[in-house]
Amino acid sequence: MSKLIYIMGPSGSGKDSLMAEARLRLAAEAPVVFAHRYITRPADAGGENHVALSRAEFQLRLSRGLFALSWESHGFAYGIGREIDIWMESGLSVVVNGSRGALSAALQAYPELLPVLIDVPEHILRERLGARGREDAGEIEARLVRARMAVVEAPELVRFDNSGPLAERGQALAGLILETTISGRKS
């Protein structure tokens, strides 16, 4: 049974690494695909593998209804393409890298989605943000404040601790994705 699995969490929580690890650990025959995001950020900016679009390209796609989900965050526009609907109609579960701020809209569009909040203790979040080298100290503090203030509530919300070793946590996420896909249950 196909499901939309909506991964979200604060910057630095390890979503990209965790999703990449889970993707590697899912068997090739598993009926699961990982959607890429369309972002108005250069492709070489670091972080996830995404489709880089100019603002004009993004707006054109948005105006033509080519995004299943879209939102703005940290000065960039993000979109998940309508192709996810085709994938789910064909029986595949789809994993997306979403946004806490866009969860409400995602639930309206896909009421049966499984929301997964990636969580790590603040000291680990601070460490990871510093290690990636994209933000200065002030920007890191601002992200930590946003992470503390963000309240994520949703039916069936799964809080997923990502403070352990990547291989272990990736295997656990792959297990959650596969269990959700096979059972058709939200959690």
UniProtKB/Swiss-Prot annotation:
Its EC number is 2.7.4.23. It catalyses: alpha-D-ribose 1,5-bisphosphate + ATP = 5-phospho-alpha-D-ribose 1-diphosphate + ADP. Pathway: Metabolic intermediate biosynthesis; 5-phospho-alpha-D-ribose 1-diphosphate biosynthesis; 5-phospho-alpha-D-ribose 1-diphosphate from D-ribose 5-phosphate (route II): step 3/3. It is an enzyme of class 2 (transferase). One of its GO terms (biological process) is 5-phosphoribose 1-diphosphate biosynthetic process. ATP binds at residues 9-16. The keyword Glycoprotein does not apply. Keywords: ATP-binding, Nucleotide-binding, Transferase. The keyword Transferase applies. One of its GO terms (molecular function) is ATP binding. Belongs to the ribose 1,5-bisphosphokinase family. Catalyzes the phosphorylation of ribose 1,5-bisphosphate to 5-phospho-D-ribosyl alpha-1-diphosphate (PRPP). This is Ribose 1,5-bisphosphate phosphokinase PhnN. It comes from Desulfomicrobium baculatum (strain DSM 4028 / VKM B-1378 / X) (Desulfovibrio baculatus). The lineage of its organism: Bacteria, Pseudomonadati, Thermodesulfobacteriota, Desulfovibrionia, Desulfovibrionales. The gene is phnN.
